[in-house]
Amino acid sequence: MKLILTVFSLLLCFLLPTSEALARPKIGLVLGGGGAAGIAHVGVLKVLEANHIPVDVIAGNSMGAVVGSLYASGMSVAEIEQVSKTLDWGKLFSDDTSHQLKSYQQKQQNADFFTVFESGVSKRGIKLSSGLIDGQKLIFELRRLLAPVAQISNFDRLPIPFRAVATDIHTGDAVVLKQGNLASAVRASMSIPGLFAPVTLDNRLLVDGLVSNNLPVDIARQMGADILIVSNIPPDNSRKLDTALDISLQSMDLLVRKTSEAQLASLTPQDILIQPPVGEVGRLDFTRVAETVALGEKGARTQLVALQRLAGSLSSDANQFATPAHPIDEVVKVASVQIENDSSLRESILRKALNIKPGDVLDNQRLQDGLNRVYTLGYFSLVDYKLTQLPSGDYGLKVIAKKATEGEHRVSVGFSLGDDFNGDTRYQAGVKYVQKGLTDSGTELRAQAVIGRRLLAEAEIYHPLGIDGTFVAPRAWYQEGDANSLDNAQQVAKIRAREARVQVDIGHPVGNSGEIRAGVFHQKTKPLPKDGTPIVADKTLTEAGVKLQYQADTLDSINFPTKGGQLTAAYTRGVTAMGSDNDFNRIELEADRVWSVHDKHRFIASGRAVATANNGAAVLDSGNNLETHALQTGHLVFSDNAPLIGNETVAGSVTYMRQVAEIPEIAKVHVGASVGVSQAWQQRDAVDLGGLRNSGTVFVGGETPIGPAFVGVRKTQGADHQAYFILGRDF
């Protein structure tokens, strides 16, 4: 019996932890909110890791929740630092979807000049979003970063147990987030009131935890922490209160200070408080990430003696405290797909966009792509998801598509201004109204009106015929605008053209970048000569017939693209039996291509050609653009900013552009130069490529809140040098 007890005792000595291990206190890490200044937490983690200090539980708020969740997911400090330095924070805090990811219809809608202001409207008036930013890009990025633990719904099962803090906006109570989707929890924790839209989780409307508990010391203690390491971002007491934003941020700092005082007072002598000296880093200053991380390290080193004392009291085995590795990704097989949709769109449209079916094997990239396609339908402010493991081991996917808070009636305003500093000042101002959801298939009414150098009144109904994307689009417009007409490449007639057109198209999308249309049209144009001898008869011209058109857009940006291109190819058949003055055939080609070299150097090649057969009348314009497209970018601007048009037209340009500076949070500044040629003829017999007119321009340009802005000098063959200024996207 004694022998058995002896052997059993020896086995216990080998199998059970030592008394030192059993007695090791649990270390809790508390990371407070602080906006961009909260990135200093990464520097604090670097010092903890360098001194082999383990972290057993983490509680964080706002930016502290972001950094804390990444660390809790198993990401190393080096990886977190790399992420913080390489993320485009400016894009994350914008809801504008990448131009490349939009459908062709959305690209067309967003390429006009109605960019100054947009809101929803209702019988009660203007309907604004519940936040300046809905946060769709942010939640996508959080999903990507936290993908390795996306299937873990209990935050105690993370490599390091974690809690995020948010605030119930109805009651003001702190809400501890300990289960669900980790990315959604973090997003809720950083929903700064007024800046980010609130997040609904478990039927509670949540905003940033700064309102109730910015420094969740008590939460870490509730998780069982014996010793706390607290990284607190102190308020900026030196901020100049010059602007409304300064006042708003100062008000939030005062609120944060009040909610943090009680938490700081609860710290014990064995707890360690770290306060990074980030006073000069603004709450929205994401351009100083590397500096902010270094300030976090600096703040942690002020407590280096206490940290090293803690490390020495725990264990001499550094490897024991290494950050847990990422969990191995599970193969997620989807057994069911539910869609929670509160918009007017029928569910089948969302399912087609999602493109995930029961039985599919799901990876994070495919899921994100599907959610993004649903978001870009244009009806939603946020598209989130939940994955729930079923008893079978497979997963149920639930997609939550939250309709846009501004509703389905949208109004947007546009404005542009141009000046040649020689008495020719032009402006355009307009309003656009879009009513979505006329039917559950996504029918839209689109109407717009513009005044200024060009007058326009237009209405279109866009009606999808099925979920495959086929649509019908009746359209009518009236417009007035300036144009040039050339005879034998010599004489210029300056014309004010009045145009009325009705058109009915049937079309189909070509992938995500293009569209093909076929339709019938009837157009009347009244040319009114302005200067010079007119070469078109002073009578109403009628064109009627059929038109086939293909358009594609693969640009990555509408104003300052770095890659991709645009293409328009159209065939028009004029038919006298349909009311046209002449039977004619016309082919139009227009293309742009962008190449980048070493990131900041770009080359843009543009060309346009029109060829017409069997038309004795002068052609004014067969599209919806009497003003020059080149005015939108300033690359190819002719003497009076009106396009050269005729039965036979050739134009081309090559542009070099380089980004030379960046004004933080405002604009990227570009310089560039362009050379081009163009000419138009009314008769094919008169075509002479030797008579092409040369032109050139140099410019400085950049983005502004209402569109691109350019200042430059242009030179056209036979004309003097001319300075010009353009603000906003022209129509």
What residue ranges belong to the model's regions?
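Patatin-like phospholipase
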Residues: 21-61, 69-383, 388-389, 403-405
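Flexible glycine-/small-residue-rich
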Residues: 166-168, 178, 276, 341-343, ...
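C-terminal outer-membrane beta-barrel translocator/porin domains of Gram-negative envelope proteins
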Residues: 376, 396, 408-420, 543-669, ...
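Outer-membrane beta-barrel and related beta-rich outer-membrane complex signature
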Residues: 243, 484-488, 525-532, 579-581, ...
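Bacterial N-terminal signal peptides
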Residues: 6-17
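Acidic/histidine-enriched alpha-helical segments
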Residues: 238, 308-325, 523, 564-567, ...
